[in-house]
């Protein structure tokens, strides 16, 4: 994320030692749970060429799979079953799951090995996401229209 537009200032230190450099298309696992993400989340860096992440994240790149398919897979939360088996939460972790890096990379994921099949699934998920975004935009515009109409009618 762009710090200036989000925080209205630069909040990062000039000393970047102790951080991971994530490149566009690479993934990071955030071990913190939040609403809707009981076992954390895996996200792909898409908006920027590079980003710096704390060593609290588990960062990785994939070479043998379709990246859009893997993004959809991690968005599905299907992988939670494996994380559940290896995670523990300590009393002082403030919502940070104890997921050892080596065990994270040893988890089993049952995904199609055929790249063409992965690509078909990814294309379907991308088309569906675009449809959702378009429908949400339509809903947002209708809500604005309703507010304007209500204001005109009831004032």
Name each region found by the language model.
Residues 1-28:
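Sequence-specific dsDNA recognition surfaces
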Residues 10-16, 93, 115, 126:
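Short, solvent-exposed loop/turn positions at domain surfaces
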Residues 20-24, 28-79:
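A short beta-sheet element
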Residues 76, 101-104, 147:
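ATP/adenylate-binding site constellation spanning eukaryotic-like Ser/Thr protein kinases
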Residues 50-56, 89-116:
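A short glycine-rich beta-alpha junction/loop motif
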Residues 111-155:
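Amphipathic alpha-helical coiled-coil/heptad-repeat segments
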Residues 55-58, 68-69, 105-106, 123-126, ...:
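Positions in alpha-helical segments
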């Amino acid at each position: 994320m762009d710090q200036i537009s989000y925080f209205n200032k630069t909040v990062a230190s000039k000393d970047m030692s102790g951080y991971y450099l994530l490149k566009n298309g690479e993934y990071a696992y955030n071990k913190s749970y939040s609403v809707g993400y009981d076992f954390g989340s895996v996200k792909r860096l898409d908006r920027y060429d590079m980003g710096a992440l704390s060593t609290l994240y588990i960062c990785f790149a994939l070479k043998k799979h379709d990246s859009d398919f893997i993004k959809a897979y991690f968005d599905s939360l299907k992988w939670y079953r494996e994380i559940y088996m290896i995670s523990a939460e300590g009393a002082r972790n403030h919502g940070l799951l104890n997921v050892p890096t080596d065990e994270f990379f040893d988890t089993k994921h049952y995904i199609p090995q055929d790249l063409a099949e992965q690509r078909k699934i990814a294309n379907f998920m991308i088309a569906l996401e675009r449809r959702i975004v378009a429908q949400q935009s339509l809903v947002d515009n209708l809500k604005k229209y309703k507010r304007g109409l209500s204001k005109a009618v009831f004032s």
